[in-house]
Amino acid sequence: MSSIVAENYNSKAVVNLWPDFIDWSKRRQGENGFLKKTLEKNKVNSVFDSCLGDGCDSIYLLKEGFDVTSNDFDLEFIKKAQENARKENVKLNISSFDWRELGRHYDKESFDAVLCLGNSLTYLFCKKDQLNTLRQFYKILKKDGILVIDERNYQYFLDEKDEILKGNFRYSGKFVYCGKKVHAYPIKIEKNRVVMEYSDKNKKNKGNLVLYPFRRNEMKKLLAEAGFKKIQQFSDYKKEFNPDADFYIYVCRK
């Protein structure tokens, strides 16, 4: 993906920190059954996990009986996911396709659900690429299928930039990124670019990611422009809108 910052990919430092940054069991506790319940409510069987990462969601759903196809562009994360799958005694079905070209590899209406979780669309910096990706997700979804996608509350980053860069960064640690051994802080906040630093407690091991900060309602507008008619928004997995939420999750119907 040419529009993705090269330094975001194949970083062993970030991949090695990731398990302690997420904490799989606490992530599941934080979502309180949200993902499984949402898929079951919408009678989902086949799932395209567009951002495999270390396998947290794909492995969980495979163990829950869903038919999962996983995708990732990062070779180091794929290795880590395969390692985790072996530990959990499940077999991953992995592809490494460019999101913007999914229609070349999958037929229209191939999946009941597409997942783009873990704040992953933020790796794309250009609106054209963001929109094209969402349209590709729409294309490979079956009629009445759902896209489940999330984003960090970047409006907070942008509004409180000065305080955050002084070291006063607010994050509950209860949702999505729940580990206590690895911490992440913004070290640069610009209009169209945020740099996050990930480090262990002793700061001996560090890694950075460069991310696009979606403004409030920006992703929601892109989802509508991509063709999704019914878009439900959740704040930290709760229905009401909370301007101080850590994460926003969208369930979008084709």
Each model region followed by its residue ranges:
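A short acidic, Gly/Pro-enriched loop at the edge of an enzyme's catalytic core
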Residues: 104-113
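Conserved class I S-adenosyl-L-methionine
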Residues: 1-53
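C-terminal lobe and adjacent flexible extensions of AdoMet/dcAdoMet transferase-like proteins
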Residues: 216-254
